């Protein structure tokens, strides 16, 4: 089965959080049963202690995990980025990275640091025996995941690394242990140089890279859809885009930027 067939035949994993657009257009999060976490504790009780850091894809997910102590006494940190858009630099989280990413988001360095870098302080300052990454299969999540993995390699992290993905349709946490060694190179190829990777990667990441590179083109499927439906309101377009392109995983910010770009033409 090639990656395209794999992607078409498999529901995208949405990394624990089920996002719905409510009547006001704001996101609300449906947190599923805690029983899965109890089962996870039975299988991997060592992941619930103080020497473990959970890195979560976004602030909403982070707050829910932290407030509910879903992973027991372990630490939590959010990665509040959208690495699937805007330029990136080879060295992750250094001064040049921060400046480049801030400019891409039309943000000040101070504002970017407060939103993205400061919440990751535990990752930079504490030594953990294990880091658990909570990221899904869509492009948004996979590019964020790739960035964190690149940082772990660049910082010569020596502990264990687990990836926890969540299947929205049946609420099952899918856990695999990752071996560091190639992700900084993959990150550089894909997110810095915008090329396909020369490394062998899982079908999920292969497909995400493929879609990421496709989204860099002017005539990608999302842009075509917006162009054909530009008479719809932004809110109507957002609702349709979230429904039609789950494998992209963009949030409202990324889509609104594309919508405005096309409507201004």
Question: Which residues fall in each region the model found?
Answer:
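A structured, charge-rich N-terminal accessory region that forms the first stable segment of a protein
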Residues: 19-109
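Acidic beta-strand-to-loop metal/phosphate-binding motif
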Residues: 55, 130-139
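A short acidic (Asp/Glu
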Residues: 63-67, 88-89, 141-149, 172-175
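Short, surface-exposed basic-aromatic patches at helix termini and helix-loop junctions that form
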Residues: 68-71, 125, 146-158
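Glycine-rich, highly charged phosphate/nucleotide-binding loops
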Residues: 106-122
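A conserved mid-domain beta-alpha-beta active-site/ligand-binding segment of alpha/beta enzyme cores
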Residues: 173-241
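Charge-enriched amphipathic alpha-helical scaffolds
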Residues: 229, 243-265
């Amino acid at each position: 089965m090639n990656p395209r067939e794999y992607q078409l035949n498999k529901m995208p994993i949405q990394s624990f959080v089920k996002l719905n657009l409510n009547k006001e257009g704001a996101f609300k999060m449906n947190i599923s049963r805690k029983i899965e976490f109890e089962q996870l504790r039975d299988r991997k009780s060592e992941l619930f202690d103080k020497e473990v850091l959970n890195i979560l894809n976004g602030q909403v997910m982070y707050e829910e995990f932290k407030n509910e102590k879903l992973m027991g006494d372990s630490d939590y940190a959010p990665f509040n980025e959208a690495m699937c858009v805007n330029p990136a630099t080879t060295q992750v989280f250094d001064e040049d990275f921060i400046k480049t990413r801030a400019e891409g988001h039309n943000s000040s360095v101070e504002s970017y640091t407060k939103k993205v870098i400061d919440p990751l302080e535990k990752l930079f300052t504490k030594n953990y025996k294990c880091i658990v990454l909570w990221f899904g299969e869509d492009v948004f999540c996979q590019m964020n995941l790739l960035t964190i993995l690149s940082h772990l390699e660049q910082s010569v992290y020596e502990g264990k690394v687990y990836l926890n993905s969540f299947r929205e349709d049946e609420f099952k946490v899918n856990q695999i242990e990752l071996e560091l060694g190639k992700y900084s190179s993959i990150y550089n190829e894909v997110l810095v140089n915008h090329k396909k990777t020369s490394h062998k990667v899982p079908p999920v990441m292969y497909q995400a890279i493929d879609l990421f590179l496709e989204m860099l083109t002017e005539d990608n499927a999302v842009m075509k859809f917006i162009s054909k439906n530009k008479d719809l309101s932004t809110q109507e377009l957002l609702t349709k885009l979230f429904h039609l392109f789950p494998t992209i995983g963009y949030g409202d910010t990324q889509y609104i930027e594309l919508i405005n770009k096309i409507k201004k033409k």
